[in-house]
């Protein structure tokens, strides 16, 4: 099995401007992500960015980069532009790794690619168990429920499944049936081409979760429990400080 990792790295960020170039132990954040992807055994790693400064930083680190349009509405649209420009075939496996995950375990990058290769779904992703009620009720922690074969039934910012009997008594404890979705995806390139041809769905606009477009149009998403739990991603200056601390002490 071979696969390509594409790392969308948008320069603009309301909470952390220039995020892909944030320095972490002497390297731009996006370069750390690129290194994790290479460690996974990917045949090819491409950073997709809308900013020439990110392009320069990746090239200086010896990486491959595609300068994309700046008007994409999502990382998946940016991914689709790269797929078309590089001429990937419909059966090629593409893994989308977020550009703000410098601590992502390389093992789960390979895991999601292998899961897709073994599945008939056009798309695969990962999740981890939720262990605290705080996380279960946090709308920023996206929950996913699956069917018996590991295909997604729904993703939500709400607490799903709703434990009616337990929560009628107390919301301080939870059972072991909650999963938090991780923002890593594997697709067949042809699936991405179909995805971007679909109009946005009502559900994704309500929840602000673009993967709901896939379920809306009747397609399957394979979900597995990740072999390793990723550490914090970088959305804020506080996140960046935590990641710098973790990497400085490795």
UniProtKB/Swiss-Prot annotation:
Listed GO molecular functions?
A: 3-deoxy-manno-octulosonate cytidylyltransferase activity
Which keywords accompany this UniProt record? Cytoplasm, Lipopolysaccharide biosynthesis, Nucleotidyltransferase, Transferase
Q: Which Pfam family, giving just one, matches this sequence?
A: CTP_transf_3
InterPro entries listed in its UniProt record: Cytidylyl_trans, KdsB, Nucleotide-diphossugar_trans
Main subcellular location: cytoplasm
For this protein, what reaction is catalysed? 3-deoxy-alpha-D-manno-oct-2-ulosonate + CTP = CMP-3-deoxy-beta-D-manno-octulosonate + diphosphate
Tell me, which GO biological process terms does this entry list?
CMP-keto-3-deoxy-D-manno-octulosonic acid biosynthetic process; lipopolysaccharide biosynthetic process
Q: What is its EC number?
A: 2.7.7.38
- CC per GO annotation: cytosol
Its localization reads: Cytoplasm
Pathway in which this enzyme or protein is active: Nucleotide-sugar biosynthesis; CMP-3-deoxy-D-manno-octulosonate biosynthesis; CMP-3-deoxy-D-manno-octulosonate from 3-deoxy-D-manno-octulosonate and CTP: step 1/1; Bacterial outer membrane biogenesis; lipopolysaccharide biosynthesis
Protein family according to the UniProt entry: Belongs to the KdsB family.
Explain the purpose of this protein. Answer: Activates KDO (a required 8-carbon sugar) for incorporation into bacterial lipopolysaccharide in Gram-negative bacteria.
Q: Which HAMAP family match?
A: KdsB
Tell me the NCBIfam families matching this sequence: kdsB, PRK05450.1-3, PRK05450.1-5, PRK13368.1
What is the protein's given name?
A: 3-deoxy-manno-octulosonate cytidylyltransferase
Q: Which organism is it from?
A: Pectobacterium carotovorum subsp. carotovorum (strain PC1)
Please name the gene that encodes this protein: kdsB
């Amino acid at each position: 099995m071979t696969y390509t990792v594409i790392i969308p790295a948008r320069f603009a960020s309301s909470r952390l401007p220039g995020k892909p170039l944030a320095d972490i132990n002497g390297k731009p954040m996006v370069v750390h992500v690129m290194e994790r992807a290479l460690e996974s055994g990917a045949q090819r790693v491409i950073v997709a960015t809308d900013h020439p400064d990110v392009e320069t930083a990746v090239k200086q680190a010896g990486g491959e980069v595609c300068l994309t349009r700046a008007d994409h509405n999502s990382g998946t649209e940016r991914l689709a532009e790269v797929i078309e420009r590089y001429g990937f075939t419909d059966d090629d496996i593409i893994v989308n790794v977020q550009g703000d995950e410098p601590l992502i375990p390389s093992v789960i990058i390979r895991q999601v690619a292998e899961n897709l290769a073994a599945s008939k779904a056009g798309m695969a992703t990962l999740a981890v168990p939720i262990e605290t009620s705080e996380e279960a009720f946090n709308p920023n922690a996206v929950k996913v429920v699956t069917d018996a074969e590991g295909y997604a039934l729904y993703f939500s910012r709400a607490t799903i499944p709703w434990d009616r009997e337990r929560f009628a008594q107390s919301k301080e404890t939870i059972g072991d049936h909650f999963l938090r979705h991780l923002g890593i995806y594997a697709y067949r390139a042809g699936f991405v081409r179909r995805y971007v041809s679909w109009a946005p769905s009502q559900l994704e606009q309500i929840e602000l979760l673009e993967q709901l477009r896939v379920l809306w149009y009747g397609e399957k998403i394979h979900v597995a429990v990740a072999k390793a739990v990723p550490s914090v991603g970088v959305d804020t200056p506080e996140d960046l400080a935590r990641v710098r601390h973790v990497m400085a002490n490795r």
